[in-house]
């Protein structure tokens, strides 16, 4: 699971990047006044402030390994008015489908390290809320999803409405709760 942390004005890991030339509103699951319980599985959400959506998802190698993907699972608002986002450059063999409400899946033939999704947003911001994405390559192995926010605690995630249902699309076989620095305050 990758989340648009940089768009939310917080630290983002060095092995992926989610960027946009546009401005976004954001909400985070954190301690204090800025707490929002309307966030998705990632503990954050971004909402477009313009009539157009332009997001780029990119993986970056830290040690020279191939980190390409040929599947992007986009987690978003379950609204019937979520905008149709399409790749700026259509990858070979592209299939787009919605396996369940709140998830749009893009799958194509060959792995690549970046994909740019674009589309018109003709409804209200909350109809187009985006929570994060899973980038997958179809190879066997372990898929690890991590969820975390600066200034978030277990109690914050526990207050998010129907959080267990929001994790369900990830189909976890094991959930590990690792309490960190935020729990010590």
Language-model features, listed with the residues they occupy:
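Conserved SGNH/GDSL esterase-like catalytic core that processes O-acyl groups on lipids
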Residues: 2-88, 95-185
């Amino acid at each position: 699971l990758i989340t648009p942390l940089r768009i939310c004005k917080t630290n983002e890991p060095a092995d992926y990047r989610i960027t946009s030339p546009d401005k976004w509103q954001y909400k985070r699951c954190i301690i204090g006044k800025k707490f929002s319980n309307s966030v998705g599985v990632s503990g954050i959400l971004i909402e477009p402030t313009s009539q157009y959506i332009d997001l780029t998802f990119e993986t970056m190698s830290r040690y020279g390994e191939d980190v390409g993907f040929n599947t992007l699972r986009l987690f978003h608002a379950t609204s019937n008015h979520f905008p149709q986002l399409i790749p700026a450059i259509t990858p070979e063999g592209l299939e787009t489908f919605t396996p369940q409400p709140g998830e749009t899946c893009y799958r194509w033939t060959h792995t690549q390290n970046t994909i740019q999704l674009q589309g018109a947003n003709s409804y209200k911001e909350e109809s187009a809320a985006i929570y994060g994405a899973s980038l997958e390559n179809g190879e066997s192995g372990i898929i690890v999803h991590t969820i975390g926010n600066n200034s978030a605690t277990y109690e914050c995630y526990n207050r998010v409405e129907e959080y267990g249902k929001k994790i369900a699309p990830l189909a976890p076989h094991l959930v590990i709760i690792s309490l960190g620095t935020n729990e010590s305050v």
